[in-house]
């Protein structure tokens, strides 16, 4: 029995998560879904965007499936990542047949350090009209995120990928913080002589994910850079509606679509569930359910290729109808 903490959150989270639950139930696996609250609505009602009982539920479950955060995102999803110590944010970038993309051969993963950098939340107003933010980079956090990235590249190499890790940084300007980041990257790389290691400045990397995305395998970077880079990368494979993510730590896993709460379309049942379904695929693999994960991804690929999609991808199905097309194919497997 897999015990899953389900947090729908705000906006379209209340649609894409239930739609994804349809697909998970179609696998026939023994799930216990434990629902918890977080986000703008619960904040307005209780004064807490992330209630203690939600934190306790998340810590008690085998994994967390999260929908979307609104205005309280920093107090919800960012805080939850820190509480669960999910230090690695995995954001796959993959082109799917039937979806307009930059190139059909795009298939790489961005690994973002999830606990440090400018998202550490250390800010202050030191004088009227003057504010500062502190960027934190530590050797310990660098070592564990780089080992995670190299281990991922090793696993992908077994599946026929190149076996390469690219580090994106700005060490030429941020000489101390990114200087340390780059130094530890190559130190850890020495432990993986079967995996190629290279580095690019983040500004150049931002160009390369558009001009030559097919050359990348695993890209590793710091918190803010990873957040920006991965959203841009999503634009090359169809947009945020197809961008899943996993937040992985030594003891916990938190899975969420990259997109936000999209209040402009919330309640209309037209939100694309693909990113959340793909996040659930990552969750299934995290739980060791590889066969079920492959079934769901294959079913989703078929649905996308046939154009059985929501309006943003040119289809005419609603959120739940698209999810049911996936679920139906999973059941038929």
Curated annotation (Swiss-Prot):
Keyword Oxidoreductase annotated: yes
SUPFAM superfamilies: Isocitrate/Isopropylmalate dehydrogenase-like
Keyword Oxidoreductase applies: yes
Catalytic activity of the protein: (2R,3S)-3-isopropylmalate + NAD(+) = 4-methyl-2-oxopentanoate + CO2 + NADH; (2R,3S)-3-methylmalate + NAD(+) = 2-oxobutanoate + CO2 + NADH; (R)-malate + NAD(+) = pyruvate + CO2 + NADH
Activity as a function of temperature: Loses 50% of its activity after heating at 80 degrees Celsius for 10 min.
Molecular function in Gene Ontology: 3-isopropylmalate dehydrogenase activity; D-malate dehydrogenase (decarboxylating) (NAD+) activity; isocitrate dehydrogenase (NAD+) activity; magnesium ion binding; NAD binding
Protein's cellular compartments: Cytoplasm
Subunit comment: Homotetramer.
Function noted in UniProt: Catalyzes the oxidation of 3-carboxy-2-hydroxy-4-methylpentanoate (3-isopropylmalate) to 3-carboxy-4-methyl-2-oxopentanoate, which decarboxylates to 4-methyl-2-oxopentanoate (2-oxoisocaproate). Also catalyzes the oxidative decarboxylation of 3-methylmalate to 2-oxobutyrate, and that of D-malate to pyruvate. Cannot use NADP(+) instead of NAD(+). Cannot catalyze the oxidation of L-malate, L-tartrate, D-tartrate, DL-isocitrate, or DL-lactate.
Name of the protein: 3-isopropylmalate/3-methylmalate dehydrogenase
Organism: Methanocaldococcus jannaschii (strain ATCC 43067 / DSM 2661 / JAL-1 / JCM 10045 / NBRC 100440) (Methanococcus jannaschii)
